[in-house]
């Protein structure tokens, strides 16, 4: 009679022992899994930070913005003393327009003609910069121009060197974190390209301005990471082109006196990442009337003036850093006035030594 109760108590004890072991195992598993779960969150956060962190060869955004400014306009950059930089620029521009030619003699219209002109220009430019001092940089620019034109008077391709430019950039004040950078600039443009005033009508296109000019200006820039603001102002004076002998419409062009010009530009650059930046800028230049001296078949000289010209461009750019030493920049420009190119596209690739 006593065996049954003893067997029952033994069975209950065994079941209690099994439940105790199961509960202990569950508690231990919960305690072990809690640290693992809490550790997984920091691990995933660290992985995200590592993915967004600057990699080897990347630059900080301030440095990228300065390089972007240099690509947008080299007038905003300076080199350290003894340093050199070579830059290659490829630029394409398209101009399509209708030219109306009219000649009034004794209040009578003796000549009226409408010419449709389309011009495609590709310019390959190599620029060499040298740091004379930490705050003074000298430069020389050599362009090679390929121009194709379609018109009633001439349709063909012309290839020749353009006008060589000699320039200098000077920073009068040391850089400051609180104040914008200020740079004074000067450029001498020499008439080394094919002059448009010396080409034979219907036999070629000019690849240069045809006269010597000097441009003096100043610009300022301020990097406010991740944005850089910049602006410029300049004035241009030109020497007259004399001793010409170009015959057009029965008259001979003997002298050209270009008018003075002023220009300004504003814009900003924005760093999208450590290796990609964008720019948006506006540029405008205004030139006074140019005086032309013409001699007719009787040897009588007369003077004619062109209209004032205003050229405005809206430029959008993208800079991509492809290596620690090279940033490739692409620019698209849209003409806003009748004196501007209809469309421009440019690629800039600086190589630093």
Where are the language model's segments positioned?
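Detector for outer-membrane/organellar transmembrane beta-barrel domains
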Residues: 81-97, 203-297
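Residues that define the transmembrane beta-barrel architecture of outer-membrane proteins
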Residues: 120-124, 157-164, 180, 208-214, ...
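Outer membrane beta-barrel transmembrane domains
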Residues: 99-112, 250-353
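Residues on the lipid-exposed face of transmembrane beta-strands in outer-membrane beta-barrel proteins
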Residues: 86-90, 126-130, 140, 166-170, ...
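Short loop/turn motifs that connect adjacent beta-strands in outer-membrane beta-barrel proteins
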Residues: 74-83, 118, 135, 173-182, ...
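Outer-membrane beta-barrel biogenesis signature
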Residues: 31-108, 177
């Amino acid at each position: 009679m006593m065996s049954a109760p003893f067997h029952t108590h033994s069975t209950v004890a065994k079941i209690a022992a099994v439940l105790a072991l199961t509960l202990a195992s569950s508690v231990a598993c919960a305690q072990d899994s809690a640290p693992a779960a809490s550790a997984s969150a920091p691990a995933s956060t660290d992985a995200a930070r590592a993915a967004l962190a600057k990699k080897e060869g990347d630059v900080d955004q301030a440095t990228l913005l300065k390089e972007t400014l240099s690509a947008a306009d080299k007038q905003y950059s300076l080199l350290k003393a003894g340093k050199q930089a070579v830059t290659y620029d490829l630029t394409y521009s398209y101009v399509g327009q209708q030219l109306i030619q009219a000649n009034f003699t004794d209040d009578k219209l003796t000549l009226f003609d409408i010419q449709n002109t389309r011009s495609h220009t590709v310019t390959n430019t190599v620029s060499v910069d040298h740091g004379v001092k930490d705050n003074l940089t000298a430069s020389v620019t050599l362009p090679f121009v390929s121009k194709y034109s379609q018109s009633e008077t001439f349709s063909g391709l012309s290839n020749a060197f353009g006008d060589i430019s000699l320039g200098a950039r000077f920073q009068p004040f040391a850089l400051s974190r609180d104040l914008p950078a200020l740079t004074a600039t000067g450029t001498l443009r020499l008439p080394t390209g094919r002059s448009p005033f010396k080409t034979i009508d219907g036999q070629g296109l000019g690849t240069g301005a045809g006269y010597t000019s000097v441009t003096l200006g100043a610009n300022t820039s301020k990097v406010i990471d991740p944005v850089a603001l910049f602006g410029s102002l300049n004035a241009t004076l030109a020497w007259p082109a004399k001793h010409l002998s170009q015959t057009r419409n029965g008259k001979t062009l003997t002298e050209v006196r270009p008018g003075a010009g002023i220009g300004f530009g504003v814009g900003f650059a924005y760093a999208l990442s450590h290796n990609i930046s964008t720019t948006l800028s506006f540029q405008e230049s205004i030139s006074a009337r140019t005086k032309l001296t013409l001699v007719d078949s009787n040897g009588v000289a007369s003077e004619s003036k062109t209209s004032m010209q205003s050229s405005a461009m809206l430029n959008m750019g993208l800079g991509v850093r492809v290596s620690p030493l090279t940033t490739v920049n692409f620019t698209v420009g849209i003409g806003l006035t009748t004196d501007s190119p209809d469309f421009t596209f440019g690629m800039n690739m600086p190589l630093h030594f």
